[in-house]
Amino acid sequence: MDMRDIQQEIFTIDELKSLLFPVFQGYDIRRAVLFGSYSKGVATPKSDVDLLVDSGLKGLKFVGLVDDIKRSLNGKDVDVIDVSHVNSGSMVEREINDSGVEIYAK
């Protein structure tokens, strides 16, 4: 499979759960929520994977988490945001509350 095929792969929510479980455990993530097109069931081959994590990680440790998530998803584009960066009442918070799917919890 070449890189273009990998980027166009669409994962199911169950696949995302099983692929990301060891990453979330390894980084001691408290909770992870899938949102965006994947949580709504409308992902296309070009969709990235949007994740909200409750990690407490900062700086290079957070970058390492994002890299490991991307690697676990065969290089698929990901957008990872920590709960500490979500502003109350923001569009992101509303989207997560409206259509987010919890895929990991401690």
Regions found by a protein language model. Name each.
Residues 1-31, 40-45, 56-106:
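Catalytic core of pol beta-like nucleotidyltransferases
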